[in-house]
Amino acid sequence: CHSAYAPEGVNAISYAARLISRLDALGESVAQQQDSRFSPPSGTLQVGTIHGGAALNIVPQSCWFDFEIRYLPGTRPQAVTDALGDYAREQLLPAMRKVAQRSDIHFQTLSHYPGLLSDPQSEFARWLAQWCGSDDFTTVAYGTEGGLFDEAGVATLICGPGSMAQGHKADEYISIPQTERCMAMLENLCAWMRADPSDSLR
């Protein structure tokens, strides 16, 4: 409806803002679960995009936003999504439907993969250290599909050149020395795959 009659419509952006505010509060609870092996030492929650409305003088009838939860291994992101869904269903929808009965709020999972915490003392880790020439294992804050393989029972470690310090920005790059180390590791891996399966770990 026209903004001159704003009380007669449900402002989708306003209700989306309330959901986002609730997410911020839930993010504080996520930050309380910490693991010093990671940096940052807690999971994170953030809204990355938001879209809504057609014109300044029209009450927006739709709004949608994307948010992500990056969670530590052993924690449950469902606790956040369940709490947000309860808030939408119990607090927001009743107020919205008092004005417009057909109002609704929908949630959709776009992607999901679990966190990963590999054992640096595993046999596979020892092989990888030999191929790389380094046993400097650490944790990272970004997500990979590694957690899916780990859940399926596949020994999983994340290894590769580059740093997120140079990622997701203009002129992102991987240095030549890092690329050369990666090639050496891949050559060692290929040599191992061609070797006799009975060969023991050296």
Q: What are these model-derived regions, one by one?
A:
Residues 1-202:
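Metal-dependent amide/peptide-bond hydrolase catalytic core
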